[in-house]
């Protein structure tokens, strides 16, 4: 297995060694991109393998991020009310904030809250056989609801500014280079774990059923399987990945706001997977890193046109790269193999003719 997939291991080894060859700023940037790659793996599972196009995964990312940010904000406040609550005239910490004084609850909630929402949403939609563009529109409607709620309840969520100004995590300074390296390495470990688990899942019997659902859901139902169960599970799993990504994002970037969980970020998440190749887990990771790396480059050097670049990239992928970057790579490998086979056939044919003489 190691021999066959040596490129995967080399890729993750390069990620592990990044603290030795990247500056502190670039390492922080890469850590953020790897958080996005976690989301991309989940979207690849539901879109590439199961045929569920979700345009609302920003919500699950945001919920995971807010759960972690609530703990960080309370820790930074040092027993006092968070500053935005004081500015809004709140005199007492809301009851749903109190559990987040405990880090264990904050970490577990970053996974449980997105999963519960995903299970609730997916069960009722998939049970009623809502799919395709209708599910995509419904997922975007959920985004609008949550963004509006988070902006409107400023005294609870910080409004449009979100939650910021975190100083420590578990007593360690977030500005410390050592803390940032530890958080980065933890992100790599989590990403690798998600990749390996998803790879095992897609190659199992469960994964084959997911692909069958994507290709012909009615036939799967006719064979005695319940597609709703499979779709709810994989959709909830992708929400868990997004929630974990949100929690790690907050720890490394130091802020979260409703704008980061809105419609545009949710669509961008799908774009990452499309660029890398929606039916490839490693392609989803590469797509997230490449797209966000290019976005960072253009926003730094050409701030006036980076949105045009993003739109142009999406159009180019749809028109010319329907299978993404990994599709191009696989196509090149396939042609190379075919060329080798033809060359071998030609050489053997020549040898046969020579042997006759």
What residues fall within each predicted segment?
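Transmembrane alpha-helices and adjacent helix-loop boundaries
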Residues: 1-357
